[in-house]
Amino acid sequence: MTTYKCIEKGIVVWLTGLPGSGKTTIATRLADLLQKEGYRVEVLDGDWARTTVSEGAGFTREERLRHLKRIAWIARLLARNGVIVICSFVSPYKQARNMVRRIVEEEGIPFLEIYVKASLEEVIRRDPKGLYKKALKGELENFTGITDPYEPPENPQLVLDTESNTIEHNVSYLYSLVKAVIE
C-alpha cells in the first residue's frame, strides 16, 4: 500500500504555451518527482481531456472556453482534496486563463500560471504530432499560432524557456516553486 504525504489543500499548476512547446513533458516529469516524494499528483492534459471529458469539443474560441471551464472545475475538485494538479493546456486566451484562475482561487486554492515559452519557429521545427504541417497547408482550422492567436501571459509566476534551457533545468525550477508553495 502506498503512503501519501497529506497536504490539506492541493495546488493547481497551469502550464500554458504553444502546441509543441514542452508543456506535457514538463508536467509528467514534475509529477514523477513529486510522486516519488509521496505526494498525490494528477496530470491533466489536452490530449486526455479531448478524448474524455471534452470529447468532441472543437477549437473555436467559445468551445475552448467551455472546455477549459470543465478542466478548471476538475482541477479545483482534485486540489481541494489535497491533490497537486498539474494542467498542461495550450489555453491560448488571456480570458480563458483568468477564468480558470478565478474558479480555482475562489476555493482558496493556490494557482500558478506557468508560461512554457518557445518561439513559433521552434515549435514548427519540433512539430511532434505533425499538426503545424497540416495547419500551414490549410488543413486545420483555428490552430493556435497559425490561424488562431496565442496570447502570452502578462504576469506568469514562472517562464520556462524550452529553447534556451534543458527540460531538466525547467523541471527543477518549477519543482522548487511548487515545493515553496506547498510547504
UniProtKB/Swiss-Prot annotation:
Q: What name does UniProt use for this protein? A: Probable adenylyl-sulfate kinase
User: Gene3D superfamilies annotated for this entry?
Assistant: P-loop containing nucleotide triphosphate hydrolases
Query: Enzyme class, one word?
Result: transferase
Source organism, top-level taxon: Archaea
Q: Does the keyword DNA-binding apply?
A: no
Family, according to the entry, reads as follows: Belongs to the APS kinase family.
**Pfam families, alphabetized:** APS_kinase
Catalytic reaction equation(s): adenosine 5'-phosphosulfate + ATP = 3'-phosphoadenylyl sulfate + ADP + H(+)
Q: What does this protein do?
A: Catalyzes the synthesis of activated sulfate.
